[in-house]
């Protein structure tokens, strides 16, 4: 597939789809006719395999009852650990360093409760002012639980432009009073990729544990955690990994920390052969499974089984290659068709700094998103003035990208957006 130059013609889009080596995966997903879904960075589409694995799990309950914990196609008792083997290639880690459990926010509470140990002058947590609000709420809660004031002990790196973070500023903020760092791998608005390898090395030079929120990176970009030495990470599985709304999240802990007792424990923290001894002294699992707390939500895990099969076949490197190409193509069309429509491109243009979605800014963003939906294009609004468009490598086409930009041009030229209020819905 040619890297450059792109062409603005419809024929170019069709030809690009013919050359797409991942095109067959589009048939794996339920896509509505007359709808262009560009919101996979918020909630991925349902695949037929994810549907099948959920139905298989329901049938296991029907057929086996309580014995479903150890019988059936996917015995529930070992499911979280077994899925770790399929996630490992996506983040470049060992399977024993990964567990499917909790949600992003509860997993943040888990890793912070484990790794945040304020002592002496090292009492502060370093985050950033652009991160997702739930991360901040969790950090503030954990600081309060230590009897400290979040206003004093939570440091947020400021953005120079309101969209991105400068890694030099992050490193400069790694001062002697920082005990722990939590940063997004990819910023949820602008899609900027942070240099996790460099930031981890700089944190470790200063004796600081560092972890990342992978919600907007896992399934979209490759990671090499074994090489980089990241201490911990958390993520959701319902965006690029297409495991469904409310699906169980994921947690990574570097194996060098396995001797550390989890900050939050429960009976599923136990070593499997000891769990049903019902002792009041925890014998923790000797891997990331120790970071589980309660009984796993089996039906919220089940769709991930089918979804991860697709990722194994497609390969994260091929997915990233297409993602980069199709987002470059969309940026080219936006520049060609929408230069006089008041849009500002808010995402990095460099491939190595751009995640899986495009971020446009416009004063009328909220009602432009409503107009797009009225025209069959599903975007994502993010306050105060952002439009996120995610052409997902597994199921979006170049033709869809071409059509969506043309529709956006029509909306702006005809001022169709003025039919709507310029404020977000209950769920943006």
UniProtKB/Swiss-Prot annotation:
One of its GO terms (molecular function) is kynureninase activity. GO terms for cellular component: cytoplasm. Pathway: Amino-acid degradation; L-kynurenine degradation; L-alanine and anthranilate from L-kynurenine: step 1/1; Cofactor biosynthesis; NAD(+) biosynthesis; quinolinate from L-kynurenine: step 2/3. InterPro entries: Kynureninase (IPR010111), PyrdxlP-dep_Trfase (IPR015424), PyrdxlP-dep_Trfase_major (IPR015421), PyrdxlP-dep_Trfase_small (IPR015422). Its EC number is 3.7.1.3. Pyridoxal 5'-phosphate binds at residues 104-105, 132-135, 213, 216, 238, 267, 295. It comes from the Bacteria. Its cofactor is pyridoxal 5'-phosphate. HAMAP family: Kynureninase. This is Kynureninase. It comes from Bacillus cytotoxicus (strain DSM 22905 / CIP 110041 / 391-98 / NVH 391-98). The lineage of its organism: Bacteria, Bacillati, Bacillota, Bacilli, Bacillales.
């Amino acid at each position: 597939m040619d890297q450059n130059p792109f062409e603005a013609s419809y024929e170019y889009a069709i030809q690009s789809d013919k050359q797409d080596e991942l095109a067959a995966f589009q048939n794996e997903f339920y896509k509505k006719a007359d709808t262009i879904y560009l919101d996979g960075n918020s909630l991925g589409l349902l695949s037929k395999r994810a549907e099948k694995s959920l139905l298989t799990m329901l049938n296991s309950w029907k057929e086996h009852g309580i014995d479903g914990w150890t019988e059936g196609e996917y015995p529930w008792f070992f499911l979280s650990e077994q899925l770790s083997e399929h996630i490992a290639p996506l983040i470049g880690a060992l399977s024993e360093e990964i567990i499917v459990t909790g949600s992003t926010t509860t997993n943040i509470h888990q890793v912070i409760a484990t790794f945040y140990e304020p002592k002496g002058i090292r009492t502060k947590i370093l985050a950033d002012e652009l991160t997702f609000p739930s991360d901040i709420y969790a950090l503030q809660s954990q600081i309060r639980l230590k009897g400290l004031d979040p206003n004093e002990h939570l440091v947020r790196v400021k953005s120079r432009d309101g969209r991105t973070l400068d890694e030099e500023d992050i490193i400069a903020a790694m001062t002697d009073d920082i005990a722990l760092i939590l940063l997004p791998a990819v910023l949820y608005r602008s899609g900027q990729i942070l240099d996790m390898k460099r930031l981890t090395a700089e944190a470790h030079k200063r004796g600081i544990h560092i972890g990342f929120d992978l919600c907007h990176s896992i399934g979209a970009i490759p990671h090499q955690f074994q090489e980089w030495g990241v201490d911990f990470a958390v993520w959701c599985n319902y965006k690029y990994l297409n495991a469904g709304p409310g699906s169980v999240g994921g947690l990574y802990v570097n194996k060098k920390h396995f001797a550390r007792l989890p900050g939050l424990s429960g009976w599923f923290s136990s070593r499997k052969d000891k769990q049903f001894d019902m002792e009041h002294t925890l014998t923790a699992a000797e891997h990331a499974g120790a970071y589980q707390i309660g009984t796993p939500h089996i039906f919220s895990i089940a769709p991930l089984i089918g979804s991860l099969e697709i990722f194994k076949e497609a390969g994260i490197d091929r997915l990233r290659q297409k993602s980069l190409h199709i987002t470059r193509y969309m940026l080219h069309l936006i520049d060609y068709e929408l230069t006089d429509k008041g849009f500002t491109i808010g995402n990095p243009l460099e491939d190595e700094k751009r995640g899986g979605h495009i971020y446009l800014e416009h004063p009328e963003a909220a009602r432009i998103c409503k107009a797009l939906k009225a025209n069959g294009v599903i975007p994502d609004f993010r306050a105060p003035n952002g439009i996120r468009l995610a052409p997902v490598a597994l199921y979006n086409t170049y033709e869809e990208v071409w059509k969506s930009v043309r529709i956006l041009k029509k909306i702006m030229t005809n001022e169709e957006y003025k039919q709507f209020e310029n404020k977000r819905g209950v769920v943006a």
